């Protein structure tokens, strides 16, 4: 079963630019542990870090699909990345997600088949 894991943290980008090499190494170690846990029970389909929300553009609803600078919603909690994993069930996805940095909120959402 495929799941999308969205990783969010309050003021994520400001924090990331301030942390030192040791803190970044801890984050990457957590990613490694997560990757190993998923590989033991399933597959990582994709995983990406996302650029700063200031680099986003959004197409708004409506017939002319206006393009605006920035993310679709303003929020202090920013999505910093995502994983798409194929695991046996939600419990396995939760177990793997617990290995990601504990300062982040992780939304786990099943992917639809069609």
Name what the model sees in each region.
Residues 1-114:
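Conserved, structured core segments of small domains
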């Amino acid at each position: 079963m495929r799941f999308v894991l969205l990783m969010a943290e309050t003021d994520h980008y400001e924090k990331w630019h301030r942390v030192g090499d040791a803190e970044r190494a801890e984050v990457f170690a957590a990613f490694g542990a997560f990757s190993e846990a998923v590989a033991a029970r399933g597959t990582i389909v994709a995983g990406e870090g996302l650029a700063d929300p200031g680099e986003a553009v959004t197409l708004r609803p409506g017939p002319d699909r206006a393009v605006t600078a920035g993310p679709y919603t303003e929020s202090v909690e920013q999505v910093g990345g995502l994983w798409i994993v194929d695991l046996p069930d939600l419990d396995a996805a939760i177990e793997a997600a617990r290995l990601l940095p504990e300062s982040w909120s992780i939304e786990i959402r099943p992917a639809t088949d069609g």
